[in-house]
């Protein structure tokens, strides 16, 4: 399975619209300027919905403690992890996190914000970033989202609106099965020698299956060992 992140970031920016949109508000209606107490990092996690993965529910490296059994608890976990500058795993394809900032991020046309990721050679897992402008000023991620174009946008091998459905294992310490919108199927392997938590399927998702949708990028990392180890 192609393991790529789908990262959803709620960023308050000053200019982002479709050509068909009719904007009636003025900039001042929704622009939130920086203040002396503004910080560069995200200040709130609205939602944390990872795909299944080896670090999900994991109590050592992953930092879970078994109490993340509701969406609210999962969001609180993710917020604290990022505050402590620890990683937050998004699992397999489609996992996402929605964060907000205490000020608007100006769209200068250059690099206006950054998203940290896995920088190890052979473990590069690119993400898709979406942004949203808080036009109604209610501080919630409830308006139109826009996917930022990247180096792979528009290429034939890039699949838009790709989806993967994950299925809860019938018993502990088993792989997570998945199917996708292209007619493929597979599994997220259970690595008992490394991560022995009972389930790689998020504990706070009550349904026996859930579907994540996003943009699928061409695979760039391959199993060179022939054993699935590297």
Across the structure, where does each feature detected by a protein language model lie?
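Sec-dependent signal peptide recognition
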Residues: 2-8
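A broad, structure-centric signal for solvent-exposed, well-ordered loop/edge residues
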Residues: 8, 138-139, 155
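C-terminal motif of bacterial Sec signal peptides marking the signal peptidase cleavage site
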Residues: 13-16
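Short, conserved catalytic or interaction motifs in soluble domains
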Residues: 19
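A domain-level signal for the mature, folded cores of soluble proteins
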Residues: 22-125, 144, 149-230
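Predominantly extracellular/luminal cell-surface or secreted proteins
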Residues: 130-134
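Acidic, glycine-anchored loop motifs typical of Ca2+
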Residues: 135-144
């Amino acid at each position: 399975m192609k393991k790529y992140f789908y990262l959803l970031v709620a960023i308050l920016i000053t200019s982002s619209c479709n050509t068909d949109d009719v904007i009636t508000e003025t900039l001042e209606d929704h622009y939130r300027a920086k203040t002396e107490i503004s910080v560069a990092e995200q200040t709130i996690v609205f939602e944390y919905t990872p795909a299944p993965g080896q670090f999900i529910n994991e109590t050592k490296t992953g930092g879970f403690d078994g109490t993340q059994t509701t969406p609210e608890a999962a969001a609180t976990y993710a917020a604290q992890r990022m505050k402590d500058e620890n990683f937050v795993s998004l699992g397999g394809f489609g996992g996402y996190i929605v964060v907000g900032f205490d000020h608007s991020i100006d769209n200068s046309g250059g690099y206006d914000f950054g998203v940290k990721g896995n920088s190890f050679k052979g473990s590069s897992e690119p993400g898709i970033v979406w942004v949203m402008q808080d036009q109604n000023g209610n501080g919630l991620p409830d308006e139109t989202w826009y996917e930022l174009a990247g180096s792979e946008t528009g290429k034939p091998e890039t699949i838009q609106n790709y989806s993967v459905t994950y299925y809860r294992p019938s018993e502990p310490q088993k792989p997570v099965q998945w199917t996708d919108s292209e007619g493929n199927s597979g599994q997220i392997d259970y690595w008992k020698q490394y991560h022995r938590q009972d389930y790689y399927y998020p504990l706070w998702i009550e349904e026996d299956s859930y579907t994540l949708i996003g943009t699928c990028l061409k695979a760039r990392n391959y199993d060179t060992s022939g054993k699935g180890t590297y």
